[in-house]
Amino acid sequence: MIVYSLLLLILYDFLPKVVTFDTVCIGLCHCVGNVVDCSSLDLSEIPTTIPNNTRILLLSDNEIESIDKSRLKGFYFLQTLDISNNIIRHIDFEFFYNLPNLKILNIRKNRLARIPRGSHELGHLEKLDLRSNLISTVTSEELSYLAAVRSVDLSRNLISYLPKPTTSAKVNIEKLDLASNSITDIGTDHFSSFNTLVTLKLARNHITTLNQFSFSRLRKLESLDLTRNMIREVRFLAFNQLPSLQNVSLARNDVYRLDDGMFYACEGLKHLNLSTNRVQAVTEGWMFGLTSLEVLDLSYNQIQSFHISSWSHTPKLKWLSLHSNRIQSLPSGSFRVLRQLEELILSANSIDSLHKFALVGMSSLHKLDLSSNTLAVCVEDGAVLYNTSMPFLRSLRFTNNQLRVIPKRAFERFPALEELDLTDNPIATIHPEAFEPLELKRLVMNSSSILCDCQISWLASWIYRLKLDKSSIIAKCSYPPPLADLYVVAIDTANLTCHNDSPRAKIVRQPVEVSTLIGEKARFTCNVYGASPLSIEWRVMENGQPRVLVQDSATFLSINRTAVVNGTFDERELAAAELLLDNVAMTDNSEYQCVARNRFGSDFSTHVKLQVYQAPKFTYTPEDMPLLVGQTAKFLCAATGTPRPEIKWAFEQIPFPAAEARRLYVTPNDDHIYIMNVTKEDQGAYTCHATNVAGQTQASANLIVFENFFHYPESPDLSPMLIKKRDALKIDCSCDLISSRQRMVWKRQQQVILFLKKAKFSDNDQILTLTQTTFSDSGEYSCELWVDDTILMRKITMVKVVNEDEFVSSEATLTQRVQRIRAMASKLVDNIKSTGNGIYLMASCSAFGLMILGVITSICICIAKCSCNQNHVFNVLPVQV
């Protein structure tokens, strides 16, 4: 086709002039240069008089129903064809052969049921607009052909199923619009062959779920629009492998479940819209990976809480909307990690309290919207915002928060504030210097409840000084009656006077601090004076946030009022409020506040503490401890109580013997007392005293010191006792056992010896004798000295039963040792004799002494051999207490 076109262009001057190559604009169409406009002419077919050198042909808004192949033949220069808004049902597939250089084809708003056949022959086509037709079916091949077109619009059709396209040799597509169809499922990897795609629109379809890898391999995708579907779940890795993705919209769906890691590997995402869904919480899991996010819209959801750590994954966030959710309170440091946040929208929630550190750390915030909550207390009680500093905040919206009083320097923590919106608040009292030190450029308010007395006289001059727009400041008087409905700025300051009997609610008797024991009662009182009716509430601080108390089985609220004469509005009343807490628990240990209100304002008492005390109660008590001399005593004593009890120890003798000998140790944060190397002097009763302001308790334990030791200790040479088969085995563990307090327990191979016919015990079980030993009697034998449930010491003996040959061999070894010693002594004497010097006598005496030593050694070895036949100790293990 391209070769054919070039040939015609070359031969153009040599061909006869025919109608199809006419360059004259004839008929109703309007021609300007290479642009021919035949739109809105009620044409039923394409005119035959259109110049063949046309580059842009506009045929929109006509009545064309079909296009046959003979139309526009020879239009080799045509680049743009607009046949939108007709009633085209059919286009001959050979029609497109006539348009080899067409770049833009607009067929929107027609009645095509399929993508026109032959359109894939348009090798230079860059934009194809099929919006608002009747296309219901798209084949894999047709999708593959579309991959060669840079921009494709198939929105507002009837497509319900999207097949997976076949592999295309040419992929140029950058923008694909499938919005407003009936697609229910996009499957996995459906768009993977469109790897050049930059923008994908799937809004207004019927998609219900986003599965893993739904958009995988679209590494150039920057914008993804899934608005107005029926998506309920977004699965793990649904947006994986999208490194260029910058904008995602999931607004107006039914999303309630967001899997952890759904945005994993989306480091480039900057804008995320999740508004108008059913998201209930902001969690660290699904926020993971959003390190470049700048804009996050979570408005119109069902969020009740958010994890503070979740924001750590979005350090670059600049704009955050939580408008119209179900948040009731803001915890400490709610947005502390969002150092770059510039605008925060928290309007239309149910927020009634802020932690005193809820908004700290937001040093870059420029705009804050707290409208339509119940946060009047944050302004009226200056202590709430005292710890909140926003040095760069320029705009604050605080509309519809039931604000009645603006105290002195209410907004001083926002020194850069320029715009303040207080509309839809029943403001009654604006104290002098309420807006200091601000230099506001815009103030918006519309209150008709102002109490016009001397305290409001400054307002008009302040408005004039700052040159504020008076039309945005509606402040009308409601009291006193002569000034009702007058604008404050229009009243002469001489008429704004104060009386001693102000109608404002005022606390005339502050509550005081209360101390009580756990399980007892606590009572607070608060007296209020002002215009009736007065309302009084009690608040308690819990985890830095106030909570209004309501009456229940353990909380009693009462108000005694003075009589109201004639029931008129101008009357005053004195109300005495009482808060009674019954059966006080440790959880009641907090700060309490009395809040008084009437239509003219509110007053807040100081925060007073309820000190709940609990008498000491032992969690661990010391226990009696038997020990041997030289061992270490360790007594444990621990107690709980409020305030924390002080632990002290006492000994029945004063002073501590161990303390004088510097053997008594107590370490910080340790509930033990240590007595090192105990002696008999340390024996006695030790008493632990736990004391605090609520009371004291004590517990005692006895230290019993014994002086036992084994009479026959052996060196731990690891050699076993050798016993000849059928001989008797005797193990002696004599240790001056006290039979009334102590007992000896024998074990073989760590098992208690209970029933063994040939085992005999004597001397209060201190001696064990085994008769007729066999090879099976070899092993480990131990004797343990016990006092009640405490072991004092243990001795282990290793026994080996051998046959007669092995036993004789061991005896021969002992005899050889004696003979060697004697030979050495004789040799030494012979050497000395050979010297022949004058010290022969001295040397002889030395040799004689050596011989005597050898004899004594031989005797000791023999005694040792005999002793081994009776008792051989392997080791003595002291018991550590």
Swiss-Prot record:
Keyword tRNA processing: no
UniProt-reported outcome of changing L102F: In wk26; small body phenotype
Endpoints of the signal sequence: 1-20
Topological domains annotated Extracellular: 21-840
GO cellular component, as recorded: cytoplasmic vesicle membrane; extracellular matrix; extracellular space; plasma membrane; side of membrane
Residues with glycosylation annotation: N247, N273, N387, N446, N495, N560, N566, N677
Biological processes annotated in GO: positive regulation of multicellular organism growth; positive regulation of transforming growth factor beta receptor signaling pathway; regulation of mesodermal cell fate specification; transforming growth factor beta receptor signaling pathway
Domain Ig-like C2-type, residue spans: 503-611, 616-704, 716-785
Xref: InterPro entries: Ig-like_dom, Ig-like_dom_sf, Ig-like_fold, Ig_I-set, Ig_sub, Ig_sub2, Leu-rich_rpt, Leu-rich_rpt_typical-subtyp
Membrane topology note: Single-pass membrane protein; Lipid-anchor; GPI-anchor
Disulphide bond pairs: C526-C594, C637-C688, C733-C783
Matches recorded under Pfam families: I-set, LRR_1, LRR_8
Cytoplasmic side: 862-881
GO MF, any single term: type II transforming growth factor beta receptor binding
Per-repeat ranges for LRR: 51-74, 75-98, 99-122, 124-145, 146-169, 170-193, 195-217, 218-241, 242-265, 267-289, 290-313, 314-337, 339-361, 362-388, 390-413, 415-437, 440-465
Stored PROSITE patterns: IG_LIKE, LRR
Subcellular compartments: Cell membrane; Cytoplasmic vesicle membrane
Function statement: Binds to the TGF-beta receptors sma-6 and daf-4, and enhances TGF-beta signaling activity in vitro. Has a role in regulation of body size.
Protein name in UniProt: Leucine-rich repeats and immunoglobulin-like domains protein sma-10
Gene: sma-10
